[in-house]
Curated annotation (Swiss-Prot):
This is Cystatin-8. Performs a specialized role during sperm development and maturation. It is found in: Secreted. Belongs to the cystatin family. The gene is CST8. Disulfide bonds join 95-105, 119-139. InterPro entries: Cystatin_dom (IPR000010), Cystatin_sf (IPR046350), Sperm_Mat_Cystatin (IPR052691). Its main location: secreted.
Length: 142
């Protein structure tokens, strides 16, 4: 009986693998499910946004850490990864880099230091493996 289950499982995954395989001509991964809205409170969305902000703050040359003010929308696309497109509003905080683990940050209130940005992050994830990659990042002044 277990042998039949394994055979069934293998036969079911073959079509999925064929659909998700890379097209060598286009060098793109097949889309299994196009972008669809997903709740911003979804655990995977939160993990992806946390990761994207860690990367943003690491790469940013700003002396201050940026925080998410508001999540505008989140969408999910399924390829060989779970791809989350997350639109957020971020702002400069009152915490300087590098951030210590026990520091509590608030949005910058000083008018000379205030700065808000609208950002879109495309994060590829295999959350069950703890794998996250910022595939695209676009930020502009809000």
């Amino acid at each position: 009986m277990p042998r039949c289950r394994w055979l069934s499982l293998i036969l079911l995954t073959i079509p999925l693998a064929l659909v998700a395989r890379k097209d060598p001509k286009k060098n793109e991964t097949g889309v299994l499910r196009k972008l669809k809205p997903v709740n911003a409170s979804n655990a995977n969305v939160k993990q992806c946004l946390w990761f994207a902000m860690q990367e943003y703050n690491k790469e940013s040359e700003d002396k201050y850490v940026f925080l998410v003010v508001k999540t505008l929308q989140a969408q999910l696309q399924v390829t060989n990864l779970l791809e989350y497109l997350i639109d957020v509003e971020i702002a400069r905080s009152d915490c300087r880099k590098p951030l210590s683990t026990n520091e509590i940050c608030a949005i910058q209130e000083n008018s000379k230091l205030k700065r808000k940005l609208s950002c879109s992050f495309l994060v590829g994830a295999l959350p069950w493996n703890g794998e996250f990659t910022v595939m695209e990042k676009k930020c502009e002044d809000a």
